[in-house]
A protein has these predicted regions:
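Conserved beta-propeller blade signature
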Residues: 76-80, 126-129, 187-191, 245-248, ...
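Beta-rich, blade/repeat-based domains predominating
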Residues: 58-74, 109-126, 167-187, 221-243, ...
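A short helix->beta-strand "capping" segment at the edge of beta-propeller domains
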Residues: 35-61, 284-293
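C-terminal motif of bacterial Sec signal peptides marking the signal peptidase cleavage site
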Residues: 19-22
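Short loop/turn segments immediately following beta-strands, especially the blade-tip
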Residues: 90-99, 154-161, 201-213, 259-279, ...
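Short, conserved, GDST-rich strand-edge loop motifs in beta-rich repeat architectures
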Residues: 130-149, 200-201, 259, 266
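Short loop/turn segments immediately following the C-termini of beta-strands
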Residues: 72, 81-84, 131-134, 192-195, ...
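Blade-level signature of beta-propeller repeat domains, shared across WD40, Kelch, NHL, RCC1
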Residues: 344-375
């Protein structure tokens, strides 16, 4: 069993958490003295930057909702598509040598990659996806409607198919999952829309490609009822390995929340018992989940969705206004960019090693790359 005691961190880090709980949400005006180049350096104008479409429906994009660079092959950009339960992989992404690879929409994709909301890579090159559905995914005589949760995958392109044969494991306690973030080893956090919680999944040992055994996992349901999903809009997550803080785009509550994952105490066991013994799935009660950024106090924030922790800053997209913000880790607004994209377009965002910004456009089935103009 995972040795996870919920005893909190050192006094120094606990002090940081307390400060976050009480800190202001940041200024609501411009800060031209602290402009960020990739957001227009205080101009907030997309015309001050280079924005290019690097992938579209011809590459298999079909309502793309999240994207992430491979943890070991940093030139590969992986994208998940809700429209047909699929994924698109861009090789040499954003360069003149770019090629696209399509996976999914195959045997088992309607369950194992059902309406994906988000993906997250671990450091060993495996990755996990989470899915927005609480419908039957294996036919009228198959598994129940709530038999959904995160899927663990190999990223070996000779094996990965986006379906049953390419999956390494799957757990089934979080229908309507809206975001996912990697913690360590085989541990992932999920924005659990069905239970309005942040749920920690430890897959432990996977069953191998195409297997079926799920019984060695551990599932912890944190801060139940304190976050709220919004249908059709992913609520992305970012886990900070240095502080054990989980940052949350809490879309339904129009805020950015922060959960101190080391707080709380083990509570009661919970169902449904589809995967693991009863004592291996339980609530964690009394954990600290506070508001870092109140969307009501930020101009044009109404449906925060994409969230990335990069370069010591939090980067947030708004699904309604297509604005991208950067905040410091105390919740202070640093800069923002108006992309000019459609209502409903922006969801997941990502950065490459050179600091270029990538985002999905779910309305137009595109991935865009934003770069600072060369002089």
């Amino acid at each position: 069993m995972l040795d996870h005691q919920f005893l909190g961190r050192s006094a120094l880090v606990l002090g940081l958490s307390a400060a976050l709980a009480g800190c202001p949400t940041g200024p609501n005006g411009d800060d031209d003295d602290a402009g960020i180049p990739i957001l227009g350096d205080g101009s907030h104008d997309i015309e001050s930057l280079d924005m290019a479409v690097i992938a579209d429906s011809g590459d298999g994009l079909n309502i793309p909702r999240d994207l992430e660079f491979h943890s070991q092959r940093p030139d590969e950009l992986w994208i998940v598509n809700r429209g047909d339960d699929s994924s698109t992989i861009l090789l040499d992404a954003g360069t003149s040598d770019q090629e696209s690879v399509f996976r999914g929409n195959t045997g088992g994709s309607a369950h194992f990659l059902a309406q994906p909301s988000a993906l997250a890579f671990s450091d060993d090159g495996t990755f996990a996806t989470i899915h927005e559905t609480d419908d039957l995914t294996q036919g009228p005589n198959g598994t129940p409607e709530d038999f959904m949760g995160p899927t663990l995958w190999t990223s070996d392109l000779d094996i990965y198919d986006g379906g049953h044969g390419g999956h390494l494991d799957m757990l089934h306690n979080s229908p309507n999952g809206m975001g996912i973030a990697w913690e360590d080893d085989r541990i992932f956090w999920v924005f659990d829309g069905y239970n309005d919680s942040l749920t920690r999944y430890n897959f432990n040992d996977d069953h191998g490609p195409g297997g079926t055994f799920h019984g060695d996992a551990e599932i912890e349901r944190h801060v139940a009822g304190e976050v709220r999903w919004r249908e059709d809009i992913p609520s992305h997550l970012a886990y900070d390995q240095d502080t054990d803080l989980l940052y949350v785009a809490d879309t339904g509550n129009n805020r950015i929340a922060v959960h101190d994952t080391t707080t709380g105490e083990r509570g009661a066991n919970h169902g449904p018992g589809y995967d693991v013994p009863a004592d291996m799935q339980y609530t964690v009660d009394g954990g600290d989940c506070s508001t870092l950024i109140d969307g009501e106090a930020i101009d044009e924030m109404g449906r925060p969705s994409g969230l990335e922790l990069h370069d010591g800053k939090l980067w947030i997209t708004d699904n309604r206004t297509a604005r991208i913000w950067a905040f410091d880790l105390e919740g202070n607004l640093l800069d923002y960019l108006d992309t000019g994209l459609d209502d409903g377009a922006l969801m997941g965002i990502e950065f490459d090693a050179d600091g270029n910004l990538y985002a999905v456009d779910a309305e137009n089935d595109e991935v865009i790359k934003i770069s600072v103009k060369s002089e």
